[in-house]
């Protein structure tokens, strides 16, 4: 059952960005982002799309979202990422494959979710978010109850949310948070080729699939 708690979902941008580390690698060249503007997502653009929309939060270097966009050209894939090297890599591949069904949100995804006024997403992937393993940094973890509550406002009925991590402690937090928001939470298998994080995972991969049932709201 969807549980709506009285929480203040409108947080300042500076609070959001504490969830992220360094935003660009060394020796990054700005010309790698040429052409990004025409692929940028906005809440107005998403609210006016007629196609099925899939969101990936933190796409890294874009392996997963790229493959999905190639395999499902009738769907629109929105990738949210703050790391500019990853954005540049995905942008390069999108142009190489001449894809027209990829949009990029190059900032904290919560800033986008706050602006959305209607149900837009049919599926959401959150694959290997930064676990911030040190206890004093746990508050920087992006996946928690307030995040799921914020996300749920933009989910279509019966939309699926898939989350994966190889950090056992974070997995427990994700699972308990999901139980407070989603009507259905179950284990799901995450393929090793889902991303470079999955392929390099030395620990067990914990995968969860949540189903949002708007009738329980």
Curated annotation (Swiss-Prot):
Name the Enzyme Commission number(s) assigned to this protein. 2.1.1.33
Instruction: List the catalytic activities from the record.
Output: guanosine(46) in tRNA + S-adenosyl-L-methionine = N(7)-methylguanosine(46) in tRNA + S-adenosyl-L-homocysteine
Sites where the protein binds substrate: 134, 166
Residues bound to S-adenosyl-L-methionine are 56, 81, 108, 130
Q: Which InterPro entries does UniProt cross-reference here?
A: SAM-dependent_MTases_sf, tRNA_(Gua-N-7)_MeTrfase_Trmb, tRNA_methyltr_TrmB_bact
Pathway assigned in UniProt = tRNA modification; N(7)-methylguanine-tRNA biosynthesis
Domain of life according to the entry: Bacteria
What is the enzyme's main class? Answer: transferase
Q: Name one GO cellular component term.
A: tRNA methyltransferase complex
The molecular function terms in GO held by this entry are:
tRNA (guanine(46)-N7)-methyltransferase activity
Q: Which UniProt keywords apply?
A: Methyltransferase, S-adenosyl-L-methionine, Transferase, tRNA processing
Q: Which residues form the active site?
A: 130
Which Pfam families does the entry link to? Methyltransf_4
PROSITE patterns assigned to the protein according to its UniProt record, in alphabetical order: SAM_MT_TRMB
Family, according to the entry, reads as follows: Belongs to the class I-like SAM-binding methyltransferase superfamily. TrmB family.
NCBIfam families, per database record: tRNA (guanosine(46)-N7)-methyltransferase TrmB (TIGR00091)
Q: Which PANTHER family match?
A: 3-DEOXY-D-MANNO-OCTULOSONIC-ACID TRANSFERASE/TRNA GUANINE-N 7 - -METHYLTRANSFERASE (PTHR23417), PENTACOTRIPEPTIDE-REPEAT REGION OF PRORP DOMAIN-CONTAINING PROTEIN (PTHR23417:SF14)
Relate the protein's function as given in its record.
Answer: Catalyzes the formation of N(7)-methylguanine at position 46 (m7G46) in tRNA.
Protein name in the entry: tRNA (guanine-N(7)-)-methyltransferase
Gene, per the UniProt record: trmB
């Amino acid at each position: 059952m969807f549980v709506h708690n009285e929480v203040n979902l409108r947080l300042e941008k500076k609070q959001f960005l504490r969830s992220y580390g360094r935003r660009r690698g060394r020796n990054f060249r700005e010309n790698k982002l040429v052409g990004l503007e025409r692929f940028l997502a906005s809440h107005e653009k998403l609210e006016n799309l007629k196609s099925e929309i899939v969101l990936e939060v933190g796409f890294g270097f874009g392996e997963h979202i790229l493959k999905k966009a190639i395999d499902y050209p009738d769907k629109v894939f929105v990738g949210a990422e703050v790391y500019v090297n990853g954005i540049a890599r995905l942008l390069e591949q999108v142009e190489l494959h001449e894809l027209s069904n990829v949009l990029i949100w190059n900032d904290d995804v919560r800033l986008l979710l706050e602006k959305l006024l209607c149900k837009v997403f049919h599926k959401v992937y959150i694959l290997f978010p930064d676990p911030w393993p040190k206890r004093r940094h746990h508050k920087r973890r992006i996946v928690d109850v307030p995040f799921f509550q914020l996300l749920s406002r933009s989910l279509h009925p019966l939309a699926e949310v898939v989350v994966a991590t190889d950090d056992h402690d974070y997995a427990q937090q994700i699972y308990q948070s999901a139980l407070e928001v989603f009507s259905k939470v179950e284990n799901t298998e995450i393929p090793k080729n889902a991303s470079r994080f999955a392929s390099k995972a030395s620990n067990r991969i914990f995968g969860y699939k949540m189903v949002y049932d708007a009738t329980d709201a």
